[in-house]
Amino acid sequence: SDLLTPWEKIEKRLLLASEADFVICLYNPSSKKRKDYLARACDILLEYKEESIICGIVRNIAREEESMNILTLKELRNTEVDMFSTVYIGNKMTKIIKHKMVTPRGYRYDKK
């Protein structure tokens, strides 16, 4: 949402986080006045992330109507979300395990 943060700053953060292959979370990604923001965000992310990156949408978190959907970044670009949605964009290590998005920490601790 650009209610408290200017869109230009959000764009820059998306670009840098995408380039660094961070897992990204978008809160309040759309509203009646901001319908195209998720598609614009996806276009920025697609500069560095593959179309097949795993993404998720959770709607109405912790409410009775909670729902979730796992999809690719390519599919996310054309998906409708609203102000009750939270969008998660995985990184190259993110995978689906038992219908959940999982991103390993990237290292292993081996006791000696």
Outline where the language-model segments fall:
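Class I SAM-dependent methyltransferase SAM-binding "motif I" and its flanking Rossmann-like core
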Residues: 1-23
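A contiguous loop/helix-start segment that scaffolds small-molecule binding in enzyme catalytic cores
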Residues: 19-112
